[in-house]
A protein has these predicted regions:
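N-terminal, non-cleaved signal-anchor transmembrane helix
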Residues: 1-58, 62-65, 69, 256-262
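Transmembrane-helix boundary motif in ABC transporter permease subunits
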Residues: 1-6, 72-104, 117, 121, ...
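Non-cytoplasmic
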Residues: 30-38, 147, 189-222
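Transmembrane alpha-helices
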Residues: 11-12, 17-24, 106, 140-141, ...
Length: 262
């Protein structure tokens, strides 16, 4: 009976994995097809021609550059603000601390379309022109929450006696932070930064409301779906996006596991 249960769980797990990843594998497969507009299964033959076409496409390179700059900038801002907010919530006592923590994390739970509409309304009411910074600010709403969530979780597992011992030995606040607290939270900061970068790089819903006429890589992919002869190139770009976001997520997961074990 127990063996049957285990077999059923394994079968269900494999079915879920297949349901989630087979569509991605199909996209990867058709990035190498020799066909330019239609899809046959299996592909008549395989080629890497579309990779050079994608790389030489000025729109793709422009969108990639914008996505990279936005992701790096949003991640840097998120790490600074998220870490400072986590330190303030962790070390100080004030009325409404739980409410502040909830408000910081809230953007993760909100649907992207709600955040996008709210930000677009604020931008329009403020007569702010759409620019690189409107995208960065919109991505920062959830990137800060990701960084904060990782850092505050690690801080709560850090013994306050370490900081007290450092201060008793004559270290000032900066020395205590640099030599005692920072080594403790560094893995969480790196993991939070990687997750924030991955989320920012492939974000499309919020970006659609705050980018104006600018095209990030996910927006370029979405707009290219209506062009049949762009499909192999679109698949190549999608493959690149998946690879670029998959690596930071895997590394962040490993860092988080290592941190939990210490």
């Amino acid at each position: 009976m127990i063996k049957r249960k285990h077999l059923g769980l394994k079968t269900a797990s494999l079915a879920v994995v297949a349901f989630l990843h087979i569509p991605i594998l199909i996209v990867f497969l058709y990035a190498f097809t020799t066909e330019s507009s239609s899809f046959q299964f299996p592909p008549p033959s395989l080629t890497t021609h579309w990779f050079s076409v994608a790389w030489n496409n000025p729109d793709v390179r422009s969108a990639l550059s914008l996505s990279m700059r936005v992701a790096f900038t949003a991640t840097a801002i998120a790490l600074i603000l998220g870490t400072l907010a986590a330190a303030a919530v962790w070390r100080t006592r004030f009325f409404g601390k739980s409410a502040v923590s909830f408000v910081i994390i809230l953007p993760i739970a909100l649907p992207g379309i709600i955040t996008g509409i709210a930000l677009r309304s604020a931008i329009t009411l403020g007569h702010v022109p759409f620019s690189f910074w409107t995208i960065v600010i919109s991505h920062g709403t959830f990137a800060v929450a990701i960084a904060y969530n990782n850092v505050i979780a690690r801080m709560r597992r850090t013994s306050g006696s370490l900081l007290e011992a450092s201060m008793d030995l004559g270290a000032n606040g900066w020395q205590t932070f640099r030599h005692v607290l920072l080594p403790q939270i560094r893995p969480a900061m790196i993991a939070g930064g990687m997750l924030a970068f991955a989320m920012s790089f492939d974000e499309i819903i919020v970006t659609t409301f705050t980018a104006g006429n600018q095209q990030t890589l996910p927006i370029w992919i979405f707009s290219s779906l209506v062009r049949p002869r762009q499909r192999p190139v679109t698949n190549v770009v999608a493959l690149f996006v998946v690879a670029l976001t998959f690596i930071p997520i895997v590394l962040a997961t490993k860092l988080t596991r290592n941190t939990e074990g210490t």
